[in-house]
Curated annotation (Swiss-Prot):
GO molecular function: imidazoleglycerol-phosphate dehydratase activity
Keywords: Amino-acid biosynthesis, Cytoplasm, Histidine biosynthesis, Lyase
Subcellular location per the Swiss-Prot or TrEMBL entry: Cytoplasm
Protein name: Imidazoleglycerol-phosphate dehydratase
EC number in record: 4.2.1.19
UniProt keyword annotation of Ribosomal protein present: no
Pathway involvement of the protein, from the record: Amino-acid biosynthesis; L-histidine biosynthesis; L-histidine from 5-phospho-alpha-D-ribose 1-diphosphate: step 6/9
Lineage per the UniProt record: Bacteria, Pseudomonadati, Acidobacteriota, Terriglobia, Bryobacterales
Length: 195
């Protein structure tokens, strides 16, 4: 069973997490930012990942450290759980309609961090989450997971739906990319011979 546990403590945040890739979508999330909790909960559920995630950050200063560091720790969890990445599909994508909103996410776990993120969110807050920080969350994730991630809302009206559609797409794309391809067995999905 591919799994990982990470504890990351800085002067700004203390974040611990446990991830099981072949899970059942179970979660225990507490970041101190309820809308971020909601996004991580639906990420676990739609990805079929078991995720425990506890964050204690300097929210009295700002949400930035907590949100960015949450992305860092999630990326570290995936990097550790994936190990040498032999036999994985490596890349995945998903397109999701959520009521009036349509979003797409594509991911490549090939070890080359890059992020293109376009959410079309036009407000400062969705729930209690500072929306500009979602980009920082994904930036932290891609660097520490060794992932190339493209996320885009094609259209939509509700800012809540836009973010939720992105996280659901992210979950489904990661689910496929992390999945094992029985034909590859212990081979790396790369002509270079390394990721």
């Amino acid at each position: 069973m591919r799994s990982a546990t990470i504890q990351r403590d800085t002067k700004e945040t203390r974040i611990g997490g446990t991830l099981k890739l072949e899970g059942r979508g179970r979660y225990e999330i507490a970041t101190g930012i309820r809308f971020l909790d909601h996004m991580l909960e639906l990420f676990a559920k739609h990805g079929g990942f078991d995720l425990k995630f506890q964050a204690d950050g300097d929210l009295d200063v700002d949400q930035h450290h907590t949100v960015e560091d949450a992305g860092i720790v999630l990326g570290q969890l995936f990097a550790k759980a994936l190990g040498d990445r032999k036999g994985i599909n490596r890349a995945g994508y998903f397109v999701l309609p959520m009521d009036e909103t349509l979003a797409v996410v594509a991911v490549d776990l090939g070890g080359r961090p890059a992020l293109v993120y376009k959410d079309r969110v036009k407000v400062r807050l969705v729930g209690d989450l500072q929306t500009e920080l979602v980009h920082d969350f994904f930036d932290g994730f891609v660097v520490h997971a060794g992932a190339n991630l493209h996320a885009k809302v094609l259209y939509g009206r509700s800012n809540h739906h836009k973010l939720e559609a992105i996280f659901k797409c992210f979950a489904r794309a990661m689910k496929y990319a992390c999945s094992k391809d029985a034909r590859l067995k212990d081979q790396l999905p790369s002509t270079k011979g390394l990721l």
